[in-house]
């Protein structure tokens, strides 16, 4: 079995959209460090409705385990091979209001960005953008720190988060090197929750299974194991 030390460090190829940094929109993206969700609650309900309709169209058969209940926040993590379909199913199969991390252009784009901002999604400027000279390192650190602090406070406030530790969607049959975001969010949110006298969040491993992930109208199954206490 491949362990994390041998997982390949593969820099993602930047898309045309990823090459365009909208500094103004990134700075104005909603965030909150008090524990409140930065998104609009009505849009959260509307997003779930849209995902549910999309699920009925995309999948011929869909099944999901009942997610283990917990009193605090929840960090759902999974491998990432199916783009926006992966986090969508993780959002749909739980009741907690979700805050997510997304590539910067998914937050600033003209259509999906409009939805993302209203649902409180937090932008991330990746190492790939910095190394390619697309993003300034200091600006990237500022945005990423702000986003991670928002995620941590939301989790401490009892909300859920969807994080893909590989940091990108890919088609390889092996795990790519993991980013540290999920672990940092877990530790920070647990510390904040305990200081506030609230239950610490848990890490919820999630299995996303497909009969053929590249087929339209394929079968899908979302698996939930026991959560990991922090």
Regions found by a protein language model. Name each.
Residues 2-8, 35-230:
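Soluble catalytic domains of membrane acyltransferases
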Residues 29-34:
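Generic N-terminal amphipathic, Lys/Arg-enriched alpha-helix
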């Amino acid at each position: 079995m491949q362990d994390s030390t041998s997982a390949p460090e593969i820099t993602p190829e930047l898309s045309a959209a990823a090459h365009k940094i909208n500094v103004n929109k990134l700075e104005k993206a909603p965030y909150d460090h008090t524990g409140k969700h930065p998104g609009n609650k009505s849009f959260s309900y509307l997003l779930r409705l849209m995902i549910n309709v999309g699920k009925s169209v995309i999948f011929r058969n869909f099944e999901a385990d009942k997610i283990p209940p917990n009193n605090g926040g929840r960090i759902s993590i999974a491998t990432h091979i199916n783009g926006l379909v992966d986090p969508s199913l993780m959002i749909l199969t739980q009741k907690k209001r979700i805050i997510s991390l997304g590539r910067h252009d998914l937050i600033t784009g003209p259509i999906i960005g409009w939805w993302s901002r209203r649902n409180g999604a937090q932008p991330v400027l990746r190492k790939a953008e910095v190394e390619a000279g697309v993003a300034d390192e200091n600006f990237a650190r500022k945005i990423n720190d702000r986003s991670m602090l928002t995620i941590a406070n939301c989790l401490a406030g009892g909300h859920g988060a969807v994080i893909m530790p590989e940091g990108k969607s890919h088609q390889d049959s092996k795990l790519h090197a993991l980013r540290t975001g999920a672990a940092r969010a877990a530790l920070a949110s647990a510390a904040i929750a305990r200081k506030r006298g609230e239950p610490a969040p848990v890490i919820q491993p999630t299995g996303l299974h497909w009969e053929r992930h590249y087929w339209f109208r394929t079968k899908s199954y979302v698996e939930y194991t026991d959560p990991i206490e922090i």
